[in-house]
């Protein structure tokens, strides 16, 4: 029932991230239960194992799949100085990322040209400005999904 995937962690070190499987073996889309798990973000709960292992924190930039972290250049690499988090500012802004991408004629291109660069911008800001209070606010807005402007941080 666990889905494992390699992600890039602090200092660019790969690690195995854990999630609840939302797409049945051999299928290409989630079933109703999987869709519920994704929408509610409950599929992320096994990442508490990653937190206990010291690979992740509760709040921080989401860990990228290999390939994207390699694209970080110059001061963008400040993101890699942090442990990745289960939730973060970019996660909040793009909490409906799947639906947003599904509306695009070329989802990968939209991700690469619009979403990912914006996530880098947000995560750089977080890396330079994070505080305990900001982390508490991020946790609050993760648990209580009310609208707010991430860019107001």
Regions found by a protein language model. Give the residues of each.
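A hydrophobic, helix-centered structural microdomain
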Residues: 1-25, 126-153
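Short, glycine-rich, amphipathic interfacial segments at transmembrane boundaries or analogous
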Residues: 1-36, 90-116
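A short, structured surface patch at a secondary-structure boundary
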Residues: 27-90, 139
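Short, surface-exposed linear patches
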Residues: 41, 79-81, 103-104, 112-116, ...
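Short, charged low-complexity intrinsically disordered segments located at boundaries
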Residues: 65-66, 78-83, 98-104, 123-125
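Short helix/strand-capping connector loops at secondary-structure junctions
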Residues: 115-126
């Amino acid at each position: 029932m666990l889905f494992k995937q390699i992600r890039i962690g602090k200092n660019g070190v790969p690690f195995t991230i854990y999630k609840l499987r939302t797409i049945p073996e051999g299928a290409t889309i989630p079933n109703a239960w999987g869709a519920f798990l994704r929408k509610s973000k409950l599929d992320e709960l096994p990442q508490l194992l990653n937190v206990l292992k010291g690979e992740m924190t509760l709040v921080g930039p989401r860990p990228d799949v290999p390939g994207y972290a390699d694209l970080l250049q110059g001061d963008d690499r400040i993101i890699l100085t942090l442990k990745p988090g289960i939730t973060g500012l970019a996660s909040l802004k793009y909490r409906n990322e799947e639906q947003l991408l599904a509306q695009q004629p070329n989802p990968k291109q939209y991700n690469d040209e619009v979403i990912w660069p914006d996530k880098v911008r947000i995560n750089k800001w977080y890396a330079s400005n994070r505080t305990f209070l900001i982390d508490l606010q991020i946790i609050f807005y993760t648990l209580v999904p009310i609208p707010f402007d991430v860019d107001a941080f």
